[in-house]
Amino acid sequence: MRDKIVLIDGHSILNRAFYGVPDLTNSEGLHTNAVYGFLNIMFKILDEERPDYLTVTFDVHAPTFRHEMFADYKGTRKPMAEELRQQVPVIKDVLRAMHIEVIEKAGLEADDLLGTLSHRCEEKGMDVSIISGDRDTLQLATEHIKIRIPKTKQGKTEVEDYYAADVQERYGVTPKEFIDVKALMGDTADNIPGVPGVGEKTATKIIQQYQTIENAYEHVDELKPPRASKNLKEFWEQAQLSKTLATIKLDADITFELENARHENPYTKEAHELFQRLEFKNLLGRFDVEASVNDVEKYFREVTGKEEIEKVFKEAEKAETVGVAFSKDAGNVLPLFAHASGYGRVSLCYEAEKIVTIPCDMDADFEYLTGKLSHLAKSVKRFSMCGLKEYLEWLPELTSENGFDVIVAAYLLNPLKNDYNAEDVAREHLNLLIDEKLDEGTKSCYEAYTAYACVPVLEKKLEENGMFRLFNEIEMPLVFTLYDMEQAGVKVEGEELKRYGEELGARIVELEKEIYEMAGEEFNINSPKQLGMILFEKLEMPHAKKTKTGYSTAADVLDKLAPEYPIVAKILEYRQLAKLKSTYADGLANYIGMDGRIHSKFNQTITATGRISSTEPNLQNIPVRMELGRLIRKVFVPKEGCVFVDADYSQIELRILAHCSGDEQLIQAYREARDIHRMTASQVFHVPFNEVTDLQRRNAKAVNFGIVYGISSFGLSQDLSISRKEAAQYIEHYFESYPGIKTFLDKCVSDAKEKGYAETLYGRRRPMPELKSSNFMQRSFGERVAMNAPIQGTAADIIKIAMIHVNEELKKRNLKSRMILQVHDELLIEADERELEEVQQILQDKMEHAAELLVPLSVDMHTGKNWYEAK
């Protein structure tokens, strides 16, 4: 049986993978889609081929012998995309970690290495499979050399296989003749000139008849069409050059020891570590290695028995830092102690070599342990956990002064990551790999160790990045404020919510009937395909080109049609009401607790700009634009004897823009409490202040807020339904009126490009990888974010400061009133009626003095018996 070798064209497959797999980045911001796609292709090939030997060849970024012959060789190629370029050294590191031989040589292309290696191996009696996305390699196909061309689309890979006979069947020429076809027709990808006027069909016919360009030249007067004959005579030297350029070397001067390419077990511990760092979780199942053989694990021990537990806590009380983890280890919870928490063990780390886990059994129930932990929280400098807010119910003695949340700290250092957990933090900040398949006890010990060991590491990094104060003075106190808000929740009138849903349902049924009547038939309004057929075929409305999936019925398409076609306006209303019913009327009902209140989760580690988000359910996206949407707020009510106080920052982002830009006119206007939108309209539209129309003021308002978000002329034209030219003039006049703003926004972009991040007044950083993208749309998006992130992020910081101060003051005065909701720039307080005036005074004072800016912060305040009235 013949031995088999697989030869992979490294750059070619990496390039294919890059464009075939959607963009991926790991938590460090490294693009990984090309590496991930490459590995998937390689594993597919290895699973199919099961080779004895494996080698990957790469191009070297340097001129080759072909460039010496023809300076413009590959001269038309665009530079490699930056996102792809940074992955080249990564894939080489991965391959070497897998003990896969990597070959590259200056002056030669990967194709020449493939040609030489395949030729040598065939001569040794081996079967060869060449994996390449470059069809030039088809010239290498023989009976024993197979060319495999992978195609990756949307992450799925298919492979075309070619032996010599397959090349002949597909292209009508032999692999060797394939070179001569290329010599005549040229190659735009490699900038091989070929013979002008000779395309693929003509070139193929000529070579089918004459086999080589040399033979064709000997019969040049017989060639057809006449133009090919004439041009081959005129460009004969160019044809010869093209053939040389297109010919892959079979005898390159390279050193190759076959034994170095032997393919045995690529799933090494080193490779496993790299896969973990690259966050290729789907590929880790291929490894049998023990990923968690870390030195730290030998210090893990389980503690049972009250005497031993008491000893552990006495030792822990003397420590400066303690890392703690709660584990839902259901297997260790006896029915007697299966309390509401669901936690089955607690783990502690109070020295690098003292990591214990305590199961909740007959000797140590959960309440006893949490009592010990709460007492411990008072005596240590740093009580550290991963996701501290989730456990504050069991730690009443813990404060923001000694509480430390490693997840929040890690988020500040990298706010672009989608998800944060102990394993990720350990890998990124401790260089510690934790196997996800571990038992709960071991995993809990690792989490406690991570919480302990990360404290000095994260504190140092926060200090180095100028965010230590942000963490200590804003983010950590906020953890406790958000916990209080979650515990408080907001009361919902269940019957009112039901009635609201019924009203929506009745109106939806009415709309369905009206839409069917106008369409002349019944159809599924929720089916884009059926809706497209009705609107664009039956009713013949103007539309974009039909695609494979049908006509687009997206909101932006229908919005343009609605003014002219009443049925479209009805469909848009139907969609809005259907969403209101499913998301709010029906959806909110599922979240009402036994106490009649909704306890939403407030998240501080999700948005890249630092804004707080709300989930389970999301109470921050309650509709405000349509009256039926706003009415949902009526179901949110204070408890008996209380009233809602809603306090909303007025134009906080514009005020921050005035402060940051130092624009004198805008600063003066805010100090004099002038109508900013009317003033902007007066300046932009060149009309006296007192003659500004309502429409002009509305348009100026859109410009004011659009500028904060780096709006383009196109975006503004869409918002205001005006021409792009008009929108560009509005923006131009705006910057003429407020020159300081233009200077500031330009500086935001240039600073972000130079530093790699945007920054708020409080030092919060938003990394800006988009600015380095080779994609124009991504770069443009990055520039808009660079303008907006300092403003939006500073607004987020200020509202957080206000929340902390308001909550602390309410508690300090022992008031019954509670802060229950935060929606961007708005705070909602459930105020005891007897404390109303005091609560309003606290809100006014703490919100308006949350930051000292060059312009005053202003708060709009309203009260009501429900959220609708208060808003």
Predicted features by range, described:
Residues 348-352, 408-436, 445-450, 604-688:
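Function-dense linear segments that define catalytic or interfacial modules
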Residues 231, 235-364, 379-383, 444-446, ...:
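Conserved "right-hand" nucleotidyltransferase catalytic core of DNA-directed polymerases
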Residues 462-474, 478, 798, 802-823, ...:
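Active-site palm subdomain of RNA-directed nucleic acid polymerases
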Residues 506-513, 517-569, 736-784, 788, ...:
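C-terminal polymerase-core module
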Residues 129-131, 138-176, 320, 345-352, ...:
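Charged catalytic and DNA/RNA-contacting regions of genome-maintenance
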Residues 2-3, 22-26, 75-251:
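Extended two-metal-dependent nuclease catalytic cores across DNA- and RNA-processing enzymes
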Residues 5-6, 10, 16-55, 71-72, ...:
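Conserved RNase H-like, two-metal-ion catalytic cores of nucleic-acid enzymes
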Residues 487, 599-600, 604-607, 682-815, ...:
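Conserved catalytic core of nucleic-acid polymerases
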